[in-house]
Curated annotation (Swiss-Prot):
It is found in: Membrane. The keyword Transmembrane helix applies. This is Acyl-lipid (9+3)-(E)-desaturase. GO terms for cellular component: membrane. It comes from Dimorphotheca sinuata.
Length: 380
C-alpha cells in the first residue's frame, strides 16, 4: 500500500510520505458518487462565454507572437536567432494550450451545447493537424479503460514477457536520450498513423482510416470528416508555403507544432507513467481503480498555459466534463476524501521525464505474486 505523493522526492519532509511510494491498489473506500458529492455543483457548470474567452485569449497571444516575427529581421545577429528560438518555445507552449481546449471540446467540456463543442474542437484540432473525431473516439476509450493492460488505448506498458529483445541495448543513458528524442519528435504522428505505443489490434490500426479497428460502424463517417479537416489545413499550409516560402512556413508553423506535439506526448506520458502507479489485467481491473492510475504533475507556470491538463488530470479522469478553469477547485474538493489514493508529484517535469524513462521500462508482478496487479520495473 503506497501513499499519495504530496511533494517531490527532493522535498520530502520527515512527516510526509515519499511520492515514489506505491499507490494503493485495493478497492477504494469511496465511490465515484461519493467523489461527485464532494465537489460543489457549480464546478460542473460549463460557461460558453467563459470557455470561448480562453480560446480567444490563446489565439490572440498566438497571433501576437506571430506578428512579432515580422520584426525579427531588424535585429542584429545573434539576437535574430535568439528571437526565433524564443518564438518557437513560446508559440509551441501557447498552441499546446489551444490543443488542450480542443481536447476539452471532445469531452463536451467547453459548453452545454455538444454541437458547439464539436465545431470549436474540430476547427482547433484540424488547424493543428489533429484528426478531431478520430482522436476523440480513441481517447474516449482510453478514459473508459485507463490502467487496463488489456484494453487501454495509449501508453500501454508492456509486460516483461513482451518486451523486445533489443530493448536492453537502449537501457543506458545514450539509449534513453535516443528513445526520448524519437518519442518527443515523432511519437505523436507515429501514434496517429501507425498506432505506435497504442493498444495492439488484430489488424492495422490508424486514426486516419475509417476502416480502422479502433472505430465502430457508427463512428466511421466522422473519421472521414476528420480527414477532410486535415486535408483543408494541409491545402492552406501548401498555399502559404507557395506564397511565403517553405522556410517561412517551417519557422512560423512547423517548429512550434513540433514543440506542441512534443509537449502533448510528454504530458500524457507523465500523467500515466510513474513508479508508484499500478496497472491491472482483466482479473483485477475495475473502472474506478483504473481511473486512479494517473498522477498530477507540476509543470510550473506551464500549468496555467496548459489549462491545468498537468496538475488537474486526476479529477479530469474522474469527471471529464468539468471545464479546465474549475479543475483545481474540484481537485481541492476531492483530495480529502481520496486520501492516499490521490497521487501528486512535484518533481520538475524534465527530471521526472528522465527518471521515468529509466525506471518504468515494463510492468511485472512482484516476485512470488500471482494476482492481476503489475508494477513498473527496469531490471531486465
Amino acid at each position: 500500500m503506497g501513499a499519495g505523493g504530496c511533494i517531490s522526492v527532493s522535498e520530502t519532509k520527515p512527516n510526509q510520505k515519499n511520492s515514489l511510494e506505491r499507490a494503493p491498489y485495493d478497492k477504494p473506500p469511496f465511490t465515484i458518487s461519493d467523489l461527485k458529492k464532494a465537489i460543489p455543483p457549480h464546478l460542473f457548470k460549463r460557461s460558453l462565454i467563459r470557455s470561448l474567452s480562453y480560446v480567444a485569449s490563446d489565439l490572440t497571444v498566438a497571433f501576437l507572437l506571430y506578428h512579432a516575427t515580422t520584426y525579427f529581421h531588424h535585429l542584429p545577429q545573434p539576437f535574430t536567432a535568439l528571437a526565433w528560438l524564443a518564438y518557437w518555445v513560446a508559440q509551441g507552449c501557447v498552441l499546446t494550450g489551444v490543443w488542450v481546449i480542443g481536447h476539452e471540446c471532445g469531452h463536451h467540456g467547453l459548453s452545454e451545447y455538444r454541437g458547439v463543442d464539436d465545431t470549436v474542437g474540430y476547427i482547433l484540432h484540424s488547424s493543428l493537424l489533429v484528426p478531431y473525431f478520430s482522436w476523440k473516439y480513441s481517447h474516449r476509450r482510453h478514459h473508459s479503460n485507463t490502467g487496463s493492460l488489456d484494453r487501454d488505448e495509449v501508453f500501454v506498458p508492456k509486460p516483461r514477457s513482451k518486451i523486445s529483445w533489443y530493448s536492453k541495448y537502449f537501457n543506458n543513458p545514450v539509449g534513453r536520450i535516443g528513445v526520448l528524442f524519437i518519442t518527443l519528435t515523432l511519437g505523436w504522428p507515429l501514434y496517429l498513423t501507425f498506432n505506435v505505443s497504442g493498444r495492439p489490434y488484430d489488424r492495422f490500426a490508424c486514426h486516419y482510416s475509417p476502416n480502422s479497428p479502433i472505430y465502430n460502424n457508427r463512428e466511421r463517417f466522422q473519421i472521414y470528416l476528420s480527414d477532410i479537416g486535415i486535408v483543408i489545413t494541409s491545402l492552406v499550409l501548401l498555399r502559404a508555403a507557395m506564397v511565403k516560402g517553405l522556410v517561412w512556413l517551417i519557422c512560423v508553423y512547423g517548429v512550434p507544432l513540433m514543440i506542441t506535439n512534443g509537449f502533448l506526448v510528454l504530458v500524457t506520458y507523465l500523467q500515466h507513467t510513474h513508479p508508484s502507479l499500478p496497472h491491472y489485467d482483466n482479473s483485477e481491473w475495475e473502472w474506478l481503480k483504473g481511473a486512479l492510475v494517473t498522477v498530477d504533475r507540476d509543470f510550473g507556470v506551464l500549468n496555467t498555459v496548459f489549462h491545468h491538463a498537468t496538475d488537474g488530470h486526476i479529477v479530469h479522469h474522474l469527471f471529464p466534463t468539468i471545464p479546465h478553469y474549475n479543475a483545481m477547485e474540484a481537485t481541492k474538493a476531492v483530495k480529502p476524501l481520496m486520501g492516499e489514493y490521490y497521487q501528486y508529484d512535484a518533481t520538475p517535469f524534465y527530471v521526472a521525464m528522465w527518471r521515468e524513462a529509466k525506471e518504468c521500462l515494463f510492468v511485472d508482478r512482484d516476485e512470488g505474486e500471482k494476482g492481476g496487479v503489475f508494477w513498473y520495473k527496469n531490471k531486465m
